[in-house]
Amino acid sequence: MEWDTVIGLEVHAQLKTKSKLFSGASTAFGATPNSQTSFIDAGLPGVLPVLNEQAIIMAIQFGLAIHGTINDLSVFERKNYFYSDLPKGYQISQYQKPIVTNGYLNIQLGNNLEKTVHIARAHLEEDAGKSLHDAHTDYTGIDLNRAGTPLLEIVTTPCLHSAEEAINYLKTLHQLVRFLGICDGNMQEGSFRCDVNLSIKPKGSSVLGTRTELKNLNSFRFIEKAIAFEQARHQDILESGLSVIQETRLYNPDNNTTQAMRGKENENDYRYFPDPDLLPIHIDKEQIEAIKNNLPDLPEAISKELKNTPSLNDEDINFILSSPDTYQYYKKIKSLCPAADKTIINWLKGQYAAFLNEHNLTFETPPISAKTMAAFLSKIHEKKISSSIAKNIFSMLCTGEKDIDAIIEREGYQQQNDNSALEEIVEQIIKQYPEQVTEYKAGKEKLLAFFIGQAMKQTKGKANPEQINLLLKKHLG
């Protein structure tokens, strides 16, 4: 029997605010457990929540970026459930009136296919604390530093039908929130987590099957494997004549299986009701327009613009869009440097990227400033240094040197462009290798590279290779 897979995704993106959603406690990652916890985060009586305005602005930015509806009225509600890392006994969230509804993202699939993924809602809520199972052998610790951190929960409709579609959507969303600057996207630190809701149904059927939820996945690779396992598990159950149980499951990467965590709750189980301590949020059109006018460059628009640059291929564009810092670095160089786009990108994704990877660096804190890199690439463009000399200079720039002219002067790297001097060198090489000259004239044109190499060797890489090429062709006939 053939089956259709139906997937809906819920992403929890931690917002990059300096303080929490309803308190002034810091959101910085990695602090000593419970050192960034306010009274309200700990669920202590006598304090009221105070809404973080920056979180509202970030939610509106996201809503605009996904072409969604920014609701002029949204409400915070209490989501009631018991868990050890939720000291209040409820989570402040949004249910009936979220801040953003009805958006979409376009994703790229294989064979140049595009799919529109519908985003039903994006709402604000506070994160829970964290259980520390490994800190002690005989009990579980609770760290409330994360409790109260603002989350934007982004919920798709059940419109995805394969692991490939799910992963492409998640990568597109991950890229978007980073370019917006609202989330750092650090999956290892839990800044971008995903819940997968999955069911299968007979191929072509309009009736959805019973779904299971895969909770708190924080790796694209794990998400892909978890979906594949759960698809196969559902199929085995149904083809055995049994029924899938609606439940929440956890993915175990050690043995590539999912394991039951608890029965899956329905909305009624959470007993949502408006939080009496928080006023409704009213957002007017003027506020939305002001935020819209200050949106940064976004990946979809950047990609369309870059695709109009004939010299750049998809690999180049993907590299430029690999992070907001990479794009800004490329953009700054391009504004300062007359070099061709392909020259810029070849250096950035070639030697520069190799150096960054080797030293565990990124374009966020580059060893060479964009201004210095632009000056360096300008020297190559103006043919003031050869490509072989450029590699030497680049290595010096990576160690902290900044004055390219001083390096050229000190090392004697000025490119030789004197035509008569280069012609003399070419004539010497032709006399020095008569056998190779005969072979070249007999049709072995690959030997031209040999002659160019000899000229570069004699000039210690300082000769202009284009001039050498022309002079050799002239003298070899």
From Swiss-Prot:
Pfam families: GatB_N (PF02934), GatB_Yqey (PF02637). It catalyses: L-glutamyl-tRNA(Gln) + L-glutamine + ATP + H2O = L-glutaminyl-tRNA(Gln) + L-glutamate + ADP + phosphate + H(+); L-aspartyl-tRNA(Asn) + L-glutamine + ATP + H2O = L-asparaginyl-tRNA(Asn) + L-glutamate + ADP + phosphate + 2 H(+). It is an enzyme of class 6 (ligase). The keyword Protein biosynthesis applies. Its EC number is 6.3.5.-. One of its GO terms (biological process) is glutaminyl-tRNAGln biosynthesis via transamidation. Keywords: ATP-binding, Ligase, Nucleotide-binding, Protein biosynthesis. Heterotrimer of A, B and C subunits. Allows the formation of correctly charged Asn-tRNA(Asn) or Gln-tRNA(Gln) through the transamidation of misacylated Asp-tRNA(Asn) or Glu-tRNA(Gln) in organisms which lack either or both of asparaginyl-tRNA or glutaminyl-tRNA synthetases. The reaction takes place in the presence of glutamine and ATP through an activated phospho-Asp-tRNA(Asn) or phospho-Glu-tRNA(Gln). This is Aspartyl/glutamyl-tRNA(Asn/Gln) amidotransferase subunit B. It comes from Legionella pneumophila (strain Corby). The lineage of its organism: Bacteria, Pseudomonadati, Pseudomonadota, Gammaproteobacteria, Legionellales. The gene is gatB.
